Amino acid sequence: MSGDTGPPKQGGTRYGSISSPPSPEPQQAPPGGTYLSEKIPIPDTESGTFSLRKLWAFTGPGFLMSIAFLDPGNIESDLQAGAVAGFKLLWVLLWATVLGLLCQRLAARLGVVTGKDLGEVCHLYYPKVPRILLWLTIELAIVGSDMQEVIGTAIAFSLLSAGRIPLWGGVLITIVDAFFFLFLDNYGLRKLEAFFGFLITIMALTFGYEYVVAQPAQGALLQGLFLPSCPGCGQPELLQAVGIIGAIIMPHNIYLHSSLVKSREVDRSRRADIREANMYFLIEATIALSVSFLINLFVMAVFGQAFYKQTNQAAFNICANSSLQDYAPIFPRNNLTVAVDIYQGGVILGCLFGPAALYIWAVGLLAAGQSSTMTGTYAGQFVMEGFLKLRWSRFARVLLTRSCAILPTVLLAVFRDLRDLSGLNDLLNVLQSLLLPFAVLPILTFTSMPALMREFANGLVSKVITSSIMVLVCAVNLYFVISYVPSLPHPAYFSLVALLAAAYLGLTTYLVWTCLITQGATLLAHSSHQRFLYGLPEEDQEKGRTSG
């Protein structure tokens, strides 16, 4: 890939850009095959005018990306936020979705302008040690997300079978369904995208049904949505807000979206085509995330109405006096506030609104788990290929990710109870929030580089907004760690936490350092890090042109 160069030489080294290839030839997919094996052509229309035909051609990557906003981890976070805070945290959901859209916009822009995904660009610009550590953190995020999909699917099977399928059985079934989706991929890219659109529609209909039957108070709902306040809130509500952010803005999804947009044929030698692609991908992502926001809103509002300040005894009585009385014992007979999870959530909906509500909830939960399976597979494959240049088949990639996810999950399902399984879901949401800097910092760094992005580099407003997101996330994560450490069960855990915290802070500091270089702190650009100012050194430019 060729492009403009920065200053001809810096310290005897010539630097240059890898962006904007001179020809529109699409990159070839690796022999193992990926989502990018097929390229979608963009129809020719009158330049400078909006075209529904073109929007339809660009539609697909944004909806696949939006599935990460609707996985079982999000559903769990939504219902717990409703149960813990009622409608008070709806504004957090709204603004987390907006911030997520801003991050995904940067991811799509990087893929369109450079023709490379975030993992590939990280491989070219970061030294080996930070690059490997960064790859490991994103793999951890992918496995954590896959564990949530396994948990959600297993609970859905248990609810649909009235408990006849045990949790461990549901976990094992997810091994089969993960490979089933690989066969769907063989029917073509557009059909695969349409299938995931169908699953999103199922979620919208099922959770929308729950919203209609629950009839949440609209006045209080609108107040919670548009007034950013939380009167009477304490640490539980704040930790729940952290969970919402971690569930909505997922690290691996930023890497995923930067790859998905490469499935459209865009002539990167023409600035007008790049600008047009950026516009249509932004419109599509906005539509997709608006749909995901409504679905999350449905869930949070339903449980804010049905569960807020509900006691275990009250929940027991409701189920004991319903047609689902066999489920009543899952609620302890005490006056403590219900600690709801996605299993109990389905049960109480069935007790309140009839068995149909329980089964419809389970179908929506199943759709959430299944839709996330394939996108997680793609994210893992793209990240591995980008960072390490290891090109595995999707079969091998699914086997690796799902094996890592299933082992701890099935052990919990066999030897512990449902509450431990749901508690793991909560912990995984917080994990996603803790790992978020390892996606946001790189995407902010590279989309702010004129040597890489040319005139499509972030402007001042975009830099300020995205940097503010980063500061907010880091502050919230720091608060969580400070709040969590005193609750450790044994002093020996402090050493482990200290070691992990040191590694975490070290990698974060390095990423902040390189990010500051692209934001204008040129004095930090020593030695090999001048590439963050001027682009790749001459000896690395050929690698940049041929990689990917």
UniProtKB/Swiss-Prot annotation:
HAMAP family: NRAMP (MF_00221). The gene is SLC11A1. Belongs to the NRAMP family. It is found in: Late endosome membrane; Lysosome membrane. Residues 74-82, 161-164, 215-237, 305-346, 416-426, 486-493 are extracellular. It comes from Bison bison (American bison). The chain crosses the membrane at residues 56-73, 83-102, 140-160, 165-184, 194-214, 238-256, 285-304, 347-366, 398-415, 427-447, 464-485, 494-513. This is Natural resistance-associated macrophage protein 1. It is a multi-pass membrane protein. One of its GO terms (cellular component) is late endosome membrane. GO terms for molecular function: cadmium ion transmembrane transporter activity; iron ion transmembrane transporter activity; manganese ion transmembrane transporter activity; metal cation:proton antiporter activity. It comes from the Eukaryota. Residues 1-55, 103-139, 185-193, 257-284, 367-397, 448-463, 514-548 are cytoplasmic. The keyword Flavoprotein does not apply. Glycans are attached at residues 321, 335. InterPro entries: NRAMP_fam (IPR001046). Macrophage-specific antiporter that fluxes metal ions in either direction against a proton gradient. Localized to late endosomal lysosomal membranes, delivers bivalent cations from the cytosol into these acidic compartments where they may directly affect antimicrobial activity. Involved in iron metabolism and host natural resistance to infection with intracellular parasites. Residues 1-38 are annotated as: Disordered. It catalyses: Zn(2+)(in) + H(+)(out) = Zn(2+)(out) + H(+)(in); Fe(2+)(in) + H(+)(out) = Fe(2+)(out) + H(+)(in); Mn(2+)(in) + H(+)(out) = Mn(2+)(out) + H(+)(in). Keywords: Endosome, Glycoprotein, Ion transport, Iron, Iron transport, Lysosome, Membrane, Transmembrane, Transmembrane helix, Transport. GO terms for biological process: iron ion transport; manganese ion transport.
